[in-house]
């Protein structure tokens, strides 16, 4: 036992953890596949459930209030490490992975639920006949989450093992570094702790005190304001520590692809639309638009039109991804079929670190969950109409299964799931099909939103879960245990999210404007005209789809480019800054070994920035939830919100950002 403890105290990720394997080379995880380690026990399960409840509540509140859902994996990993250290638990690495895996259901379920289901409450103001309940919200989230897990498991080996070193997995990398540094203890965890403290404090000052702006824009100077107003050209960069760290881990190559997509939208399409349609009101698919294109701000043109091109690009990139992944999908289904016939290999022959839930259980489980979803649609959503329920379950099954690989792929590349874009496409497709079979009006809206909620949660869960499985692969946990206990976390998170959503609706009301819920408002804006025969921006979707095909033919990663077109500019530019730091610190020395060590140290610093920023995001959310913003203001710690409208707040932001970058570079070169 003492020997094992010493081994874990000196744990270190193998040299080949993040690079592609050479021919014949195998990856040996931190925890040996030939040994058994503590993973699932009362400690890890209770802590996992507690994390799922706490982070679901915090993420739901923050997501509905400002539209941002933080990823919970990293802060949960930090808490798990802290709790096991305080309790002096030995060999806690496997337990901490399980705590993180159960708890991380929170972010996935929250994203799935709040992107779609609040649209029911938003549309209720216009259509009082639309009603929902806790049980509907819970079932849509829970069934979608469980489907996401079941549909992803057959692709685990491909994404985490077969593609080893080919994808950056930024969030999984950061979380793994947190868990490993916690297991190491002592001096080896110092870079992570230092950067976590700096990054956390930096982002907390912005989020809670507002001492400087979170973005630096070209509007900081007079000519920049004129350029934005007249030419619709604007430059924006988020100066947060967490996004900078994310850029470092993504790397310069993928960051550039993403940023080029963003610049194509913001510097070509947005100004181009203003020039071409300056005095026209383009509201064929959204009657709420009353301004001419020329009267809009660049941000409004992006939200109203250009972003739809990104959605079309993501959808087509997803379809291309499905076509390219068809062999993997076919092999996964074939393997499941062989197991069902009893021709699969014995579980005892498979390494501990490669054991998944039996495909027989996955197949039977999928059928049961789909049957339950069908019954839910038939009795709770479609009011007993068999045709509508059958069409609904077919749409949900096909879209959720096929787009599972797209969600996992996006997380593997940028750590960001374009789930809202894919869900918007699902809603549009569902609305068109349901109207075609005769379900329209408010009843059709409710049905499409519930269906969208199931799909959205399934895709969100698939993207989140591939992160957990990659962490487990690097560290050497048993996949079957992660997969089995993920279901519990999903149910707990779904119940918590349903409760918080109803509580916030009763307290503030989604139609009041107190809750931003931007994604749900976007869904409501799209679905209302569709269900009433107005239509969708098919031309814009088509342009995005065509662009994705051209990019693919030119060997440019279409999904990364389309993600850049969909995600706001200010969140894409810092990825390039972080990627450039990565390139700089790993190429300055003539000694390859020095460059390698600096790169690894940089990964620790970046992980600390992400971890600190994410953890402080939770703290800020809890302060807002408790209403302590007024107390901070009374204490003189926070500045008035009007300060952010002052250009000087952006100047302060740029100065702080430069100091943060200099700190990053300096610490990596020690």
Residue spans for each PLM region:
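Alpha-helical multipass membrane-protein architecture
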Residues: 1-670
């Amino acid at each position: 036992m003492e020997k094992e403890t010493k081994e874990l105290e000196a744990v270190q990720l193998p040299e080949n953890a993040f690079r592609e394997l050479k021919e014949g080379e195998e990856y040996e995880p931190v925890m040996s596949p030939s040994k058994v380690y503590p993973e699932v026990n009362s400690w890890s399960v209770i802590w996992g459930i507690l994390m799922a409840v706490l982070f679901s509540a915090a993420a739901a509140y923050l997501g509905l209030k400002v539209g941002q859902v933080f990823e919970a994996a990293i802060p949960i990993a930090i808490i798990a490490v802290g709790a096991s250290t305080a309790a002096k638990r030995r060999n806690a690495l496997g337990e901490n992975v399980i705590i993180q895996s159960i708890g991380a259901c929170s972010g996935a379920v929250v994203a799935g639920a709040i992107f779609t289901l609040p649209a029911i409450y938003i549309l209720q103001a216009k259509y009082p006949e639309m009603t929902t309940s806790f049980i509907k919200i819970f079932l849509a989230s829970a069934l979608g989450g469980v489907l996401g897990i079941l549909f992803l498991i057959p692709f685990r080996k491909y994404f985490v093992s077969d593609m080893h070193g080919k994808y950056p997995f930024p969030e999984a990398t950061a979380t793994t570094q947190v868990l490993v540094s916690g297991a190491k203890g002592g001096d080896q965890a110092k870079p992570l702790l230092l950067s976590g403290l700096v990054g956390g404090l930096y982002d907390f000052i912005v989020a809670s005190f507002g001492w400087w702006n979170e973005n630096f824009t070209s509007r900081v100077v007079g000519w920049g304001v004129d350029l934005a107003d007249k030419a619709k050209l604007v430059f924006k960069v988020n100066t947060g520590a967490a996004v900078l760290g994310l850029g470092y881990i993504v790397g310069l190559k993928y960051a550039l692809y993403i940023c080029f997509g963003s610049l194509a939208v913001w510097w070509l399409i947005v100004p181009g639309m203003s020039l071409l349609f300056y005095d026209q009101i383009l509201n064929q698919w959204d009657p709420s638009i009353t301004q001419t294109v020329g009267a809009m701000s660049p941000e409004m043109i992006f939200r109203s039109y250009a972003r739809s091109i990104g959605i079309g690009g993501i959808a087509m990139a997803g379809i291309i991804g499905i076509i390219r992944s068809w062999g993997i999908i076919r092999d996964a289904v074939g393997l499941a079929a062989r197991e069902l016939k009893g021709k699969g290999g014995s579980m005892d022959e498979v390494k501990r670190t490669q054991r998944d839930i039996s495909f027989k259980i996955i197949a039977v489980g999928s059928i049961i969950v789909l049957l339950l979803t069908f019954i839910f649609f038939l009795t709770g959503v479609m009011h007993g109409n068999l045709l509508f329920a059958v069409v609904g379950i077919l749409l949900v099954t096909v879209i959720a299964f096929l787009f599972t690989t797209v969600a996992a792929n996006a997380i593997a590349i940028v750590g960001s799931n374009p789930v809202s874009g894919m869900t918007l496409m699902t809603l549009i497709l569902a609305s068109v099909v349901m109207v075609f079979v005769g379900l329209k009006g408010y009843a059709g809206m409710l049905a499409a939103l519930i269906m969208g909620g199931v799909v959205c949660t399934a895709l969100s869960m698939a993207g989140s879960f591939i992160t957990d499985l990659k962490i487990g692969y690097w560290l050497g946990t048993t996949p079957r245990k992660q997969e089995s206990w993920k279901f519990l976390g999903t149910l707990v998170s779904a119940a918590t999210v349903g409760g918080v959503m109803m509580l916030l609706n009763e307290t503030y009301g989604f139609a009041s404007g107190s809750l931003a819920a931007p994604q749900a408002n976007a869904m409501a804006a799209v679905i209302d005209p569709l269900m009433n025969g107005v239509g969708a921006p098919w031309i814009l979707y088509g342009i995005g789809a065509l662009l994705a095909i051209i990019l693919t033919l030119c060997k440019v990663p279409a999904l990364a480019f389309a993600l850049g077109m969909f995600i706001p500019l200010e969140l894409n530019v810092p990825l390039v800054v972080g990627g450039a730091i990565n390139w700089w610190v790993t190429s300055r020395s003539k000694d390859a070994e020095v460059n390698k060590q600096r790169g690894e140290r940089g990964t620790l610093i970046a992980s600390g920035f992400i971890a600190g920023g994410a953890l402080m995001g939770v703290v800020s959310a809890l302060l807002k939830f408790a209403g302590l913003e007024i107390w901070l203001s009374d204490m003189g710690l926070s500045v008035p919100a009007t300060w952010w409208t002052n250009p000087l707040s952006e100047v302060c932001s740029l100065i702080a950002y430069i100091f943060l970058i200099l700190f990053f570079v300096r610490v990596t070169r020690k």
